């Protein structure tokens, strides 16, 4: 398991800023939460993203939320949804590598 809290996930364009939370009890699975469109101000700190992550954590799931490229401390530039698909895959790969049986 990966240490929980703020972290950076290596990405082809540099890194993705992320927050990983694990429940206090044995977890039942993992979840990835993505934020709204960044050109509209979306970040992983959006209240809907935060509350969704909190709800998933309360339900016993590991919750990973992250900033897409060019948002917050994530590197790269906005790519009109093309590169952002790679960001989702990178975050999913991170979860698969660190929680292989989930």
What is the role of each PLM region?
Residues 1-7:
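A domain-start/cap signature at the N-terminus of enzymes
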Residues 1, 13-15:
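Short amphipathic alpha-helical surface micro-motifs
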């Amino acid at each position: 398991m990966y240490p929980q809290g703020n972290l950076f996930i290596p990405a082809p364009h540099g890194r993705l800023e992320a927050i990983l939370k694990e429940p206090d009890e044995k977890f039942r699975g993992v979840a990835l939460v993505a934020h709204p469109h960044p050109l509209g101000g979306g970040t992983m700190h959006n209240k809907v993203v935060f509350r969704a992550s909190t709800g998933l954590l309360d339900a016993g799931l590991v919750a990973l939320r992250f900033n897409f490229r060019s948002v917050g401390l994530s590197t790269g530039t906005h790519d009109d949804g093309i590169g952002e698909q790679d960001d989702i895959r990178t975050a999913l790969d991170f979860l698969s590598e660190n929680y292989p049986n989930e």
